[in-house]
Amino acid sequence: MKRIVVVSGLSGAGKTTAMGFLEDLGYFCVDNVPGNILEELLKLFMSSDLEKMAMAIDVRSEHLGDPISAVERIKEKTNTLVIFLEASTEELLRRYALTRRRHPLQKDGIGLEDAIEKERKILSRIKEIADVVIDTTSMNTHQLRETLTHFLVNQSGGTSVRIMSFGFKHGIPMDADFVFDARFLPNPHYVPELSSKTGLDSKVEAYFKNYPVVEEFIEKIYEVLKVAIEEYQRTGRRIVTVGIGCTGGKHRSVYIAHRLKEMLEKEGFTVIEKHRDIEKV
């Protein structure tokens, strides 16, 4: 079966990295595709002997046609995965300061921050129809490639679940569909022999086993997610991102995220586990 990937997102969020990775995987890649030739390009691809194609759409694609409507029509006809990349404004400002590149909307006296927010609004429609939204704020190139690999492997069908532990003091993940707050639970950070360990450690696990409220909370989250995931599968949603947060993202959220992964995998769901802030102080 022919496979099509559409990559879009904010300038500076990683589209170039994503397209380079897709090219390495053998995809025929076309960058900055104007909206008025998307469907014509699809026809050429479908009649060719190529098996995989990736198309990048950014804010400049709107100048020639409506790329979003074209992508919606393509999704109805083909096995297409739409990936949207974003990052926090603060991180995008930092990246632009490092590269000293000019934002595509930064003209007529408009500042960089205003250009970023304008682009966010313009691309909000394509974010809404994306199968996968990836927040690259805390990712390096390797982590982005690893995340893309997971979604591409599972492109053939079904709903994948991405469970991410995080620390509220480091910010809530922008791409989370669900966020659960574990800060009310007992905290092993205040136990001297457990403070330096993580929620993946057997001694921390034993600590949580002493508190029935922890398991009760996990069971409640599991029940909610099971209903939601099954409904997402029915409607064709490709990915659900679940954020589990505690104060620092090292103990409670990590333990709960890992337990939920184990429980959901037993039900046959495809799950990717990520601990965003586990190495942070």
Curated annotation (Swiss-Prot):
Keyword ATP-binding: yes
Keywords carried by this UniProt record: ATP-binding, GTP-binding, Nucleotide-binding
InterPro entries, sorted: P-loop_NTPase, RapZ-like, RapZ-like_N, RapZ_C
Keyword ATP-binding included in the entry's annotation: yes
Chain residues that bind GTP: D58, V59, R60, S61
MF GO annotations: ATP binding; GTP binding
SUPFAM superfamilies given in the database record: P-loop containing nucleoside triphosphate hydrolases
Pfam families per UniProt: PapZ_C (PF22740), RapZ-like_N (PF03668)
UniProt-annotated binding residues for ATP: G9, L10, S11, G12, A13, G14, K15, T16
Family in the record: Belongs to the RapZ-like family.
Record-linked NCBIfam families: PRK05416.1
The protein's role, per its UniProt record: Displays ATPase and GTPase activities.
Protein name in the entry: Nucleotide-binding protein TRQ2_1124
Taxonomic source organism: Thermotoga sp. (strain RQ2)
Lineage: Bacteria, Thermotogati, Thermotogota, Thermotogae, Thermotogales
